Amino acid sequence: MTATSLWELAERARKRLSEIAKGNRDRALLAMADLLEARWEEVLRANREDLEEAERTGLPKAKLDRLALKEKDLKTLTEGLRQIARLPDPLGRIEGLAKRPNGLRVGRMRVPLGLIGFIYEARPGATVEAVSVALKAGNAMLLRGGKEAFRSNRALVALWHEALEEAGLPEEAVTLVPTTDREAVLEMCRLELLDLLIPRGGEELIRLVQQEARVPVLAHAKGVNHLYVDEKADLSMALRLALNGKTQRPAVCNALEAVLVHEKVAEAFLPRLEKAMREKGVELRACPRALPLLKEAVPAREDEWDREYLDLVLRVKVVSGLEEALAHIARYGSRHTEAICTEDPKAAWRFLEEVDASLVLWNASTRFNDGFELGLGAEIGISTSKLHAYGPMGPLELTTLKWVALGEGQERT
């Protein structure tokens, strides 16, 4: 695909932005939910073709897991669409309206960001979730999905076009870059017609987009997520949280990658953790202080403490207390998701206040860092950068504020 043809796709989308913002966006979301329920088998058929080719080419297991659509995904996606449709319209409301001494009323109005470029790896569910969030906020989307999911994405975008037509909205609101050529990623990075670029995938993709982009970038980076088991933790609860965080779905960004255990409870907790993880097929990699308490763990290398496994592998470290846990997270964490298990409110609140992450949890699984679970309906990604948005990005995070002033003929003196 040439840079010129990509420019033309983006230009057509930009020309329809005002129609998208003013149109019946909720109707399009509800229509898409209905179409998914009626035509899910078509989507699964395209997804099976993608999976067969990916398996032939040796795609890693973690990526195959993200590529695969399952029957249960239908319920998650349709519930998310309908939940977003029920959310208040984020556009048009004026915030902070205040009257100046001269009678001029000033405030800030919520408006769409505009045309968003979304570059993402082999995760077709994001073609539904990301578009639904962007559309609710009145934005148009230019999509470049991973080549492994091309058939799945094409089938889903075709349904989006039907939903948009049913709602009286232009199909340019959702445009799929019609090529698997990696050069299209670089062309999107150079496309100055975009108002924002959102990359969602591995470190290599994120770094490439950040280096090459000529427009603002909101990065969805890796999740090096920790659970700190405090000396006053309920150890049965801590075990459940560790199992849920690591084994429910290990190949996602909010999965648990490391457990930090207070030295006073390590002897009681670590053998239980090893037994439970072994039953789930999880390999433990441990620090020197933890190794004597574990029968089958292997030593953790120094260069892997900041690694995102996306697999059934878990790091374990014994720490002297909260201070060391905080220091470890500050050094190795990725500002994604961090959790503490404790019955001590003082320790919990210090953890909540001092840990720098997009979601910090007390006595809950890291798996809750998700737009649907946090009441956003869905998300376009989880931002680990602080400018504009931090954490799951729902419709509100895909708007911006412009100043408006309501006058009665005031002139500046």
Swiss-Prot record:
One of its GO terms (molecular function) is glutamate-5-semialdehyde dehydrogenase activity. The gene is proA. Pathway: Amino-acid biosynthesis; L-proline biosynthesis; L-glutamate 5-semialdehyde from L-glutamate: step 2/2. InterPro entries: Ald_DH/histidinol_DH, Ald_DH_C, Ald_DH_N, Aldehyde_DH_dom, G-glutamylP_reductase_CS, Glu-5-SA_DH, GPR_dom. It comes from Thermus thermophilus (strain ATCC BAA-163 / DSM 7039 / HB27). One of its GO terms (cellular component) is cytoplasm. This is Gamma-glutamyl phosphate reductase. It comes from the Bacteria. GO terms for biological process: L-proline biosynthetic process. It catalyses: L-glutamate 5-semialdehyde + phosphate + NADP(+) = L-glutamyl 5-phosphate + NADPH + H(+). Catalyzes the NADPH-dependent reduction of L-glutamate 5-phosphate into L-glutamate 5-semialdehyde and phosphate. The product spontaneously undergoes cyclization to form 1-pyrroline-5-carboxylate. Belongs to the gamma-glutamyl phosphate reductase family. It is an enzyme of class 1 (oxidoreductase). Pfam families: Aldedh. Keywords: Amino-acid biosynthesis, Cytoplasm, NADP, Oxidoreductase, Proline biosynthesis. It is found in: Cytoplasm.
